[in-house]
Design a protein with these regions (language model features):
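Core RecA-like ATPase module of SF1/SF2 helicases and allied nucleic-acid translocases
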Residues: 1-176, 180-181
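Short beta-alpha junction loops
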Residues: 184-189
């Protein structure tokens, strides 16, 4: 079973914006022990870059396709034709997507991806290393952002409780050369 935590995704995006003021995207690892969290972070980073493309008038088939995939995922395929029929201009649609994200997922930092306003092609060319803890063993990077995901009153961190979990945490914590950012719920972890 894989878990998601939208509050932590929002925090990751805000941290990425901060880190991009000092580092290049290739200097960043974004890690989580949960694949669902990693996939969602990748989607939201790509969406933010795609929204930059729209604002910078860099629309491309890849940007349009990425936005459509995102909308299909979160609005449902059956609602897409109505969405396009009812909305006016493309910028109104983008504005709607932003307010939808802010309301549904608490994504207040969805407006751009860093002050550098990276485009979707920048992100696809450079690619943040957004991956699970297991996949980066033996690798290091200047900045590591870790989203632990689990948040509950029972202090249940799932598989991270066991010996293997402690080893995974140790691997994740030791990958940063310069900056380590931990995103977690302190009462849980």
């Amino acid at each position: 079973e894989s878990y998601l935590n939208y509050g932590e995704i929002s925090a990751v995006l805000l941290e990425v914006d901060e880190v991009l003021e000092r580092y290049h995207p290739e200097d960043i690892f974004i890690l989580s022990p949960y694949k669902a969290q990693i996939k969602a972070i990748e989607r939201f980073i790509s969406l933010k870059a795609g929204l930059n493309d729209f604002e910078l008038r860099l629309e491309s088939p890849a940007t349009n396709e990425g936005l459509l995939k995102f909308l299909e995922t979160w609005l449902g395929k059956e609602n897409i034709p109505e969405f396009y029929k009812d909305m006016g201009s493309l910028l109104e649609k983008i504005s709607y997507v932003r307010s939808f994200l802010a309301d549904k997922f608490y994504m207040k930092g969805i407006y751009n991806l860093g002050k550098k306003r990276l485009s979707l092609s920048d992100i696809q060319a450079i690619r943040f290393t957004v991956d699970t803890v297991d996949s980066i063993q033996g690798q290091e990077n200047k900045v590591v952002i870790i989203s632990f995901v689990r948040s509950n009153r029972k202090k249940n961190v799932g598989f991270l409780n066991g010996f293997d979990g402690l080893q995974r945490i140790n691997v994740a914590l030791s990958r940063a050369k310069k900056e380590l950012v931990l995103i977690w719920n302190p009462p849980t972890v």
